[in-house]
Each structure stands twice: as structure tokens, then as C-alpha cells.
Amino acid sequence: MMNPLIIKLGGVLLDSEEALERLFTALVNYRESHQRPLVIVHGGGCVVDELMKGLNLPVKKKDGLRVTPADQIGIITGALAGTANKTLLAWAKKHHIASVGLFLGDGDSVNVTQLDEALGHVGLAQPGSPKLINMLLENGFLPVVSSIGVTDDGQLMNVNADQAATALAATLGADLILLSDVSGILDGKGQRIAEMTASKAEQLIDQGIITDGMIVKVNAALDAARALGRPVDIASWRHAEQLPALFNGTPIGTRILA
């Protein structure tokens, strides 16, 4: 089996039928012309935000990471492992892709511990066991994995989806693409940066050009590139016509170098 490709989905993608249609069309085209196994990892911040708003619950973030109190982890699990995950499975079904919905704890695929008590039920993801997902891939299934994990003592944890995808890529020896709303990392003039190193990233963070959630994304990609010993791509799902090329290894966004 070729080494898998993990496609991490994020941003408002889950809110846009047009974007999902384009993405799954690109996935079908890619699967028809390539034997390479694919895995989807997703967050779903927009789904969670909508639900929290509907329930009049405050959304708090610290350093770009969502604060998850004990009384909210059930709601967030329902949104991510439930609504967001099953929405993607429904799209896969519509496009005749045999898929399986998972969370990080299934088959101990990703090991999770609490990241920081101040963040509540927010988990740190570490590589786990490849056995379950490899079995699914060998049988032609598309695993769709939500970024909810569970600790050894049975506590549910909300994990940053970029970090979850990184840990799963390390588990499977997979290549990683982080798909988001933006076409990559932009410089101070709004131009896409084709390649990024750790020192360049630090410089742009110090200058205030890379901020908030993008800092988390860049750090996750740098961590992934280091852990995997290979480049990681950050790109946009908006350019659907370019996605098959991206899945095939052609950079269309920002390539993060270890």
C-alpha cells in the first residue's frame, strides 16, 4: 500500500455546499486515477460556533485555541463527532465513496492527554496505533476522522484539528495537506508565500503578520514537517480545479519545510 495522504479540512468549508461539492468531486477524480489511500481529518469550528450561539453559550479562545469547560465538552463532541462528521459522510455517500466515520480514540489511533487545565477539555494529540485505519484503507474505505479524542481515564477532549491531523500523519507515516479558507500564508502585502521555514515563520509572527489562528496553523504545520521529516502543504479548498494537482504533490498554497 502506498503511504496515505491525509487531507485536513477546516474553516467554513463545512458550511458551504458549493465548496463540499467541489471538494468531493476532486476526491472522486483523484481516487479514480490514483491508487493512493486517502484519510480526511476535520474540525468544525463554524458548526460549534453556530451551536454555541444558538444555546447562548460564550465562545472563549486562548492563544487561538478554544477554551472547553466541562459543561461544554458534550455539546462540542456532538457538533464535531456528530454533525460535522456525519455531514462529511453524507457527502461521501452522495459521491459513492465508501467511508467510515471515526474519532481519534477509535482503535487508539491517536493518543490524547489534557493540554492545559486553563483550557479545560482541550487535548494534546500524540501518535497512536495505525492498525484500525490501515485495515480500513486496505479494504478501500475512506476514513473520516473528527478531532475529538479521549484520555486514558476516559475524559473526552477537544483537539485542535491541525494538531490532530499531524499526530495521525505521524501514526500512519502519511503526507499531510492542511486545507483552509486561505490560499496559504500571506505576507504583509496579502501575497501568497510559496515556501516557509521555521525561521521565516518566527520572523513573520514577531512582525505581527502571522496572527491568531494562523499562528496555531503554521506551528502545527512546522511540527508536522519536523515530525514527519517531509514538507506539509497549507492550501485553500476554494480552488477546486487545483485540488487534484495538490493531492498529487504539486504545491498550490504554502509549502512548509522542516
Curated annotation (Swiss-Prot):
**Keyword Cytoplasm set for record:** yes
- A Pfam family annotated for this UniProt entry: AA_kinase
For the protein in the UniProt heading, the enzyme class is transferase
Enumerate the Gene Ontology biological process terms.
arginine biosynthetic process via ornithine; L-arginine biosynthetic process
Binding of substrate: at which residues? Answer: 44-45, 66, 158
List residues binding ATP. 181-186, 209-211
PANTHER family found in the cross-reference section: N-ACETYLGLUTAMATE SYNTHASE, N-ACETYLGLUTAMATE SYNTHASE, MITOCHONDRIAL
Per the entry, what this protein does is: Catalyzes the ATP-dependent phosphorylation of N-acetyl-L-glutamate.
> What subcellular compartments does it reside in?
Cytoplasm
The GO terms this record gives for MF are: acetylglutamate kinase activity; ATP binding
A GO CC annotation given for this chain: cytoplasm
Reactions performed catalytically: N-acetyl-L-glutamate + ATP = N-acetyl-L-glutamyl 5-phosphate + ADP
Give EC number(s), comma-separated: 2.7.2.8
Q: Which organism is it from?
A: Salmonella typhimurium (strain LT2 / SGSC1412 / ATCC 700720)
Subunit details for this protein? Homodimer.
Q: What keywords are assigned to this protein? A: Amino-acid biosynthesis, Arginine biosynthesis, ATP-binding, Cytoplasm, Kinase, Nucleotide-binding, Transferase
Encoding gene (name): argB
What's the family? Belongs to the acetylglutamate kinase family. ArgB subfamily.
Spell out the protein name for this chain.
Acetylglutamate kinase
The site annotation (Transition state stabilizer) covers 8, 217
Give the primary localization class: cytoplasm
Q: In which pathway does it act?
A: Amino-acid biosynthesis; L-arginine biosynthesis; N(2)-acetyl-L-ornithine from L-glutamate: step 2/4
